[in-house]
C-alpha cells in the first residue's frame, strides 16, 4: 500500500497500477465497492482521517489501465491444466494468479458474462459494467481463457477433458434466514438479481419495507426506490441509525435517495398488508 501511494503521489500511475496488481487482481472492483474496513484501524484516524486507499487504488486503475494492459504477458506454460468453475471475483482472481505462475487456466461461467455477484446482483449505481469488464481484461491478459454460457455438471466432466486441477468458485448463494415469523418476504439477493436483470419486473406496489441495517439492506432500499410505481421505501432496523452496520457513505446515499428510516423496531410479521413490529430500547 505505501508503495503505490508513493507512486501515485509522484505521478507514476502505471507503476502504481503494476504494484497493485502484484497482490490484487481486481483493482476496479476493489477500488469501487471494497468495504474498506481497514480504514477504521488506520492510524491517521488519530490525527485527521483515514488514508483513502480505495479511492487512490481506483484512480491508479483508471489512469494506468490503457498503458499497463498491453504490457501484461502470459507466463511460460507449466504442466498444470486448471479449470476454474465460476467467473466471479474469487474465480477471476484465482485464474489471474495461477496463469501468472504458468498454469494453463480456463474459467467456466454459466452466465453470458464474467463478474459474478458484482455483475448480476450489486446494483449498477454501485458499480458499472465498464469497471467489471476492465477487471476481466486484466485477469485474462496473463493467458487465462474465459468460457461463458457453460454450466459444469460435475468435476468428472472436466477431468475427462484433461484438466489436472479444478477450483470450485461458485459463491455462497444460500438464502439468508427469514426475517419474519409470518407473512411473505423477498430474499435480498434474489430481489437484487431480478431487478438488475429486468428493472420493473417485480410489482412492489407503492410502499416498500426493507428489514436490516447493513450495506445489502441499503442496496435493496435504493434499488426499490427507483422501481416503477414505488413511492415510499422505509428501512426498518432493530437498533438506531447510529448503530447500523452499514458504511456511513451507504447510509448517506440512501438518505439522499429518499429512503426513510424507522429505528428501534423488531419486525414480527405481515398481516393484511401491515408490518407488525415490537418496539425496542437500546440497552
Where are the regions a protein language model picked out?
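Flanking helices and flexible, charged tails adjoining ferredoxin-like Fe-S electron-transfer domains
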Residues: 51-53, 57-82, 100, 104, ...
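A conserved short coil-to-beta-strand element within the FAD-binding core of flavoproteins
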Residues: 148-161, 264-274
Amino acid at each position: 500500500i505505501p508503495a503505490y501511494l508513493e507512486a501515485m503521489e509522484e505521478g507514476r500511475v502505471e507503476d502504481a497500477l503494476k504494484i497493485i496488481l502484484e497482490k490484487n487482481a481486481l483493482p476496479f472492483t476493489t477500488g469501487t465497492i471494497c468495504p474498506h474496513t481497514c480504514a477504521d484501524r488506520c492510524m491517521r484516524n488519530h490525527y485527521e482521517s483515514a488514508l483513502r486507499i480505495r479511492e487512490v487504488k481506483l484512480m491508479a486503475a483508471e489512469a494506468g489501465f490503457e498503458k499497463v494492459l498491453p504490457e501484461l504477458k502470459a507466463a511460460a506454460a507449466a504442466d498444470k491444466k486448471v479449470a476454474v468453475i465460476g467467473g466471479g471475483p474469487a474465480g477471476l482472481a484465482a485464474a489471474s494468479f495461477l496463469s501468472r505462475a504458468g498454469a494453463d487456466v480456463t474459467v467456466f461461467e454459466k452466465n453470458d458474462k464474467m463478474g459474478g455477484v458484482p455483475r448480476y446482483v450489486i446494483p449498477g449505481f454501485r458499480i458499472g459494467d465498464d469497471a467489471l469488464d476492465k477487471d476481466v481484461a486484466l485477469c485474462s491478459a496473463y493467458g487465462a481463457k474465459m468460457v461463458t454460457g457453460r454450466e459444469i455438471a460435475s468435476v468428472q466432466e472436466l477431468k475427462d477433458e484433461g484438466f489436472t486441477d479444478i477450483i470450485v468458485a461458485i459463491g455462497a448463494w444460500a438464502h439468508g434466514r427469514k426475517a419474519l415469523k409470518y407473512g411473505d418476504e423477498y430474499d435480498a439477493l434474489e430481489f437484487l438479481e431480478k431487478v438488475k436483470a429486468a428493472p420493473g419486473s417485480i410489482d412492489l406496489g407503492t410502499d416498500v419495507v426493507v428489514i436490516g441495517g447493513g450495506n445489502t439492506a441499503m442496496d435493496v432500499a435504493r434499488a426499490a426506490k427507483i422501481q416503477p410505481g414505488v413511492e415510499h421505501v422505509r428501512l426498518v432496523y432493530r437498533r438506531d441509525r447510529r448503530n447500523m452496520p452499514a458504511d456511513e457513505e451507504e447510509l448517506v446515499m440512501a438518505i439522499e435517495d429518499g429512503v426513510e428510516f424507522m429505528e428501534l423496531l423488531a419486525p414480527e410479521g405481515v398481516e393484511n398488508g401491515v408490518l407488525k413490529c415490537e418496539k425496542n430500547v437500546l440497552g
